[in-house]
Amino acid sequence: MGKTERKKELLELFEYEKIKGDVSYSSIMKKAGGNGKGFLDRYFALHRNYILYYKLGKSSLKPDDKQEPQGYINLMDCNPDDTKEIAPLMFQISHKHRTYIVKAKDESSMKQFLTLLIARIRSLEKIDIDKLGCTVVVLTKVKKFREVLTNPLILPDRVSPEMAEEWVKQMKNYNASFNLADPFIKQVEQISEFCRGEVKEYIDWFGGPEGPRLAMIRCEETVLSNWVEYINKTSSEITTYQDNRFFREDFKDIAVHLKNMTTFIDCYNDYMIHCRKYNNNKPNTKFLEEKQTFKEYIEKFIPKVASCNDVSLNQFYDRSLIQSSDGIVTINTSGIKKTLINQSNIISITSTTTTTTTTTTTTCSMPNMSNLIHSLDHTNLNIIDLNHSKSQQQLHPPPSPHHQHLHHQIVSNSKDFNISVSSNNFNDGNSEFPNLDINCDFDLTSASNLSSPILSSEVPSNVVDPIGSGQGGGGSGGGGVTAVTEEAINEKWHFDCNTSMIFKPPSEDGRNEGSNMSTSSITSKMSLSLNGGFDMKWVYQCGYFKSKNMGSISWNGKHWCWSHPRTSYKIKYIWDPTKQSFLNIPFKSRVGATGGGSVPSSQSTNNLQSSTSSMSSLSSSSTSTTKRSHPTTLYPDYQFKDNLLTPIIIEGRHQPSLTLIDSPLTIPNACLLTIAMTQYIQDALIHLSLGPKVLSSK
């Protein structure tokens, strides 16, 4: 009897330091000693298939770390029916060699210990120790399971359609391996002789929070919920998929996307049947109606792929009618630009010389810079350098050694306008050197000020602000309107038939260098300072007019739609062949929507491929979008007749500054509309903080 409960090798294994982190329950109770010694305090610990009892020192509540137990009770040799309470605060543990009598200190601890003890004995009764084998056999089996269910088990949280079937197959293998390993591991972990070293390490991981079962559950939840989200989203939006999609590439993308959704449905049901555990009931297959709908739309779009031709701009006009040797058609545009002059926009110019204290003050109104230039001419001064506070863009040739730099700073919030200039009569420091300070209070907070020449905002003909502020009459100035100036606009654009490119040639203004710069050159440079950076070229490729930094315009002969990858805002027109007109379709923004609402639908290729190309593509779109509110501009309709494009004046719509776009030869009417809308596109981009300088700074 003493031999069976005090084997030296086991006592060494049960040093308190080795088992204290692996104890199910522990308590100080009194054990009946042999040879009539009565009840003695012992520290009882329930450790896997053993009860260990330690001798305590005086006033000690726990054994020392290096202390071996006084003895142990192998629960695999105990009878659960005879292990029971025999008297108040007293119970017995029935072992095949001996009955242990234990007295608890309180009723609660006794019942808790006895409940755990009996449950452990009954669980151990079900284990066939011979089937498990020896320690070497157990270690070999654990290593085989570890080859499949590796530690750590890395599983994806997103699975692309191309990998969906492979993922389901892999999860089936994981589940099959887990179903074999789980009962074996649960038996091994109850046997203290087996559960040590690398076996214990693997078992602890297997049943822990990072183990295979919980890892597979987390993977299942994220992957399947992502599939369900895409299936439901596609089902709700499928009727709108052909809106603004008219090209072969569009229909190909839609067909591929719908096939991917049917793959998701098949793989989802396959997973639910073979990998989910149910109580004798197979799950009902889901999304069968959606799958049938997807198949019907696939059959609808596949013929369109075959019938669509590769879109070329040549199909929209007769190329043979262009007789120009270089294939370039010059397009003339004309109109009137109106400028507001506000009471607050008054400049005081003070000129002070270094040799005398003479002060000259000139007053002119802004933003009419010509008055300022005439004032400067009276003082025989020239503007040498011009810097904008935002762009820091130099707009002049390098100054000569006899010129001092002019400093120009615009701070829109404080409305300060400061300029310092120098004299062109500087002779070795002996002549008078006047310094000029200009202070101006004018409003630069409106994006239209930054997008219009000469620091001015256009005067709306009706009640709509050009950038969509929705305010009319007063413009963007800080004070009341005192005058409205008008300036004729005459610009030229070119259409290159060979490259299908629309472009605006560089302005000849501002190319004269030196001190004899004209008023027009200075104002032109100032205009470029505020509007510069836009690439004034549109190239038609694969159904789109594409610009370097102004977005793209889809055109298929019927629908004209401008979009930009960093905003959901769009400008849409539809061609009405009966009226020979382009009719504007007002943009409908969601309530509270901002520019970052979604990826533009015209970017259909990117949008659909985001769910088909790779595993990471099923995650949320990484495309950065602007968070500014959308413009509310109501754009005019345009009529096309005899190669002329003119706006149709409608009450409530904005009246454009370009009132005539004239082509001497027949070219695609969409080219003329693109020219007419370029300024509006620039205004919208600046309003959305997507102007070229903003983008380049980011």
UniProtKB/Swiss-Prot annotation:
Gene Ontology annotations of biological process type: adenylate cyclase-modulating G protein-coupled receptor signaling pathway; aggregation involved in sorocarp development; chemotaxis; MAPK cascade; phosphatidylinositol-mediated signaling; regulation of actin polymerization or depolymerization; regulation of adenylate cyclase-activating G protein-coupled receptor signaling pathway; sorocarp development
Organism: Dictyostelium discoideum
InterPro entries given in the database record: PH-like_dom_sf, PH_domain, PI-Interact_SigTrans_Reg
Gene inactivation effect: dagA and piaA double mutants require both proteins for reconstitution and activation of adenylyl cyclase.
PANTHER family, A to Z: PROTEIN CRAC, TANDEM PH DOMAIN CONTAINING PROTEIN
Low complexity composition-biased segments: 601-626
GO cellular component: cell leading edge; cytoplasmic side of plasma membrane; cytosol; leading edge membrane; macropinocytic cup; membrane; phagocytic cup; plasma membrane
Limits of the PH domain: 22-122
Phylogenetic lineage: Eukaryota, Amoebozoa, Evosea, Eumycetozoa, Dictyostelia
Function: Couples activated G protein to adenylyl cyclase signal transduction from surface cAMP receptor. Pianissimo a cytosolic regulator and CRAC, are both essential for activation of the enzyme adenylyl cyclase. Pianissimo and CRAC do not function redundantly. Both proteins are integral components of the adenylyl cyclase activation pathway.
Protein name: Protein CRAC
Pfam families: PH
Region (Disordered): 594-630
Keywords carried by this UniProt record: Cytoplasm, Developmental protein
SUPFAM superfamilies in alphabetical order: PH domain-like
Gene: dagA
Compartments, record wording: Cytoplasm
Recorded GO MF terms: enzyme activator activity; phosphatidylinositol-3,4,5-trisphosphate binding; phosphatidylinositol-3,4-bisphosphate binding; phospholipid binding; protein kinase regulator activity
Coiled-coil region: none
